[in-house]
Amino acid sequence: MGDGNLKKSKLSWPKTLVKKWLNIKSKSEDFHADDLDRGEGGGDWRNNVIEREEACSVRKSKTETRSKRNSGRARRNKLDVDPPLDHLRVFTATWNVAGKSPPSYLNLDDWLHTSPPSDIYVLGFQEIVPLNAGNVLGTEDNGPARKWVSLIRRTLNSLPGGSCQTPSPVPHPVAELDSDFEGDSAAGANSLFYHRSRSMRMDASASSLPQQFDRRFSVCDRFMLGDTPDDFYDQSFRYCSSEDEPADSPCHDHYSPVSRTGSFVADDRDKGRDKSKYCLVASKQMVGIFLTVWVKSDLRDSVNNLKVSCVGRGLMGYLGNKGSISISMSVHQTSFCFVCSHLTSGQKEGDELRRNSDVLEILRKTRFPRVNNAGDDKSPQMISEHDRVIWLGDLNYRIALSYRSAKALVEMRDWRALLEKDQLRIEQRKGCVFEGWKEGTIYFPPTYKYSNNSDIYAGDDRLPKAKRRTPAWCDRILWHGSGISQLSYVRGESRFSDHRPVYSLFSVEIESAYRNRIKKSSSYTSSRIEVEELLPQRYGYSELNPY
């Protein structure tokens, strides 16, 4: 059995390589999500969501005729109601983790615990695996992605308070985004997540702990991931690849949560846990780029038209070591698009033009094809067609100053002077990139590049092997569309990577109550239709209508 799976894995490697080199895109349905049929959030991941689409199409085919008649009755009753607006709290974050796999002791509580909890969490990562030839040209390493999902799930489902049946009310903005740069007090008020505890830092003692080994999977292999134990990182759980460890390796003495079929084995105590507060609606990995979207479990049934599109902008302009992952979805009547990107690196003059080209190509090539007979004939097909768009990631735009000049301004905390030389702001003012997009006021220091496990920028320590990089705001969050209000825009202080994570909290308008009213009214018309179908044909609806 094991030899057969190993042979299958080896055969899938050339297939993956050919797909990458010829830029053969995977199906848009290929993403991971919690099983919607399960009562709890910790359900199965699915590599292929065609089953879900087919189930939806079957249900639609059974009710399509009745729905059309119901909508006609609703129009006949003149239910012309303007769609009222509700508000959702949307937490977004981007983090370049420098190719490091998350250890078991990495605590995300301070990162994800907002007050009150958000309705939607959009978490984007870059470099979740090292960008070496094996990962770029060969099979993708899905082990770190599964670890991040397990950590995020455990953290979100430990949020204080229960899940709400209604969207969150509109909170008051933390600070006025147009206030003066010099307003340090305003900046302090705006720093909802600015002061981070040491729980997310990589202390020297923690660094000495043994590292886990990851089993590698091919992106072409179909596998189902079952319930992930909340204490996935318990010492009794350890897994490794037979190719990575010799037969007498200590890791073979531990129970492996990954079976030979590529499935997680749920712990018995995990089967009886309570319903999860949050569920994973979509996650996608492209080499080192990883994007996950989580929603409150009570909001899950309102999410529909989920689609994913990937654009590679790396080697030869096609491979996935650079590029973007975009997730399109609708919440009730409002369409969302979340874009996570890792753009071309480099601080030489002219590199910003390559980043501009990356953005334009991502906007041009990202497509969300409509599914026939799936009820999404009006769903947006391009990023710009969505009602609400949030773009996050390592955009890699630098500061057009020398290292010494930029460092001096950082020490003076003169963010205004630094932002005047920020390449992204410069290119936006020229109209070369992100025209019409918005970004909140930056009150925090540049997020790149830090020395290993320290708060010192690379180059300050003057180590002979240290690469000197001009400090820059590489990690950004922008948005496009009306009905989006930014409540905070801050960075975290984790030393886990040479980048600092960046977070933003939004209040987003959605049209939702209109659907509820139509549903309620259609329930009345549905009952009348059923009565009509049972009566002799000589009686018409107009003769029997008592309303």
Curated annotation (Swiss-Prot):
Keywords: Hydrolase. Residues 56-80 are annotated as: Disordered. Signal peptide: none annotated. InterPro entries: Endo/exonu/phosph_ase_sf, IP5P_plant, IPPc. One of its GO terms (biological process) is phosphatidylinositol dephosphorylation. Residues 56-67 have a biased composition (Basic and acidic residues). Residues 387-402 are annotated as: Catalytic 1. Residues 467-482 are annotated as: Catalytic 2. One of its GO terms (molecular function) is inositol-polyphosphate 5-phosphatase activity. SUPFAM superfamilies: DNase I-like (SSF56219). This is Type I inositol polyphosphate 5-phosphatase 4. It comes from Arabidopsis thaliana (Mouse-ear cress). The gene is IP5P4.
